[in-house]
Amino acid sequence: FYSSILPNLYSYILVHSKRISTEALNSQAAALRMRGRPKVVLARTYEEAMEYYDKYADNILGVISDVRFPKDGVKDPEAGIKLLREIRRRDEFVPLILESSETNNREKAEKEGFRFVDKNSKKMNIDLRHLMEEHMGFGDFIFRDPKTRKEVARIASLKQLQDNIFNIPYDSMLFHIS
């Protein structure tokens, strides 16, 4: 499974990073932005995942986890749920995505407040990209009304933000910067 998702994940991150680097003022700034692009870290056990989480906790954009993998030296059918629960306990805001080929895990994920990706879906890569755009900051920045949660502005670049900053409702701006 990793061999199918990782190339798509890397490709998506690279495309997004290139898009951001084009907004740089000069080639040096563009190079710095490319070096600062998000990294993908692959853990094969619960313990390894927690080591990475502890090491990079302040810089994590989100966590994507399978359901079944080793924990305490034994394959655990709910290791991913336990992992995401522990991460949620430590950080209530980090986006968490559970992926599984077993559709009954969707209900478990939703009950815990995690996003879910079905590994059997023909559009799994599209679903994953959509979740990354929506919840990990890879897409446009969407300003929402703090009361209704309806979209009030969509910003795709720093130039667009500069051009529209005074058109964004004050309460929405405060909501997103606080």
Residue ranges of model-derived segments:
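Acidic, metal-coordinating helix/loop segments flanking the phosphotransfer/catalytic sites
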Residues: R19-G62
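Short amphipathic alpha-helix used as the core "switch/output" element in two-component signaling
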Residues: E51, D72-F93
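Death-fold homotypic interaction modules
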Residues: G137-S178
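A generic structural signal for alpha->beta connector loops
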Residues: R37-K39, F93, G113
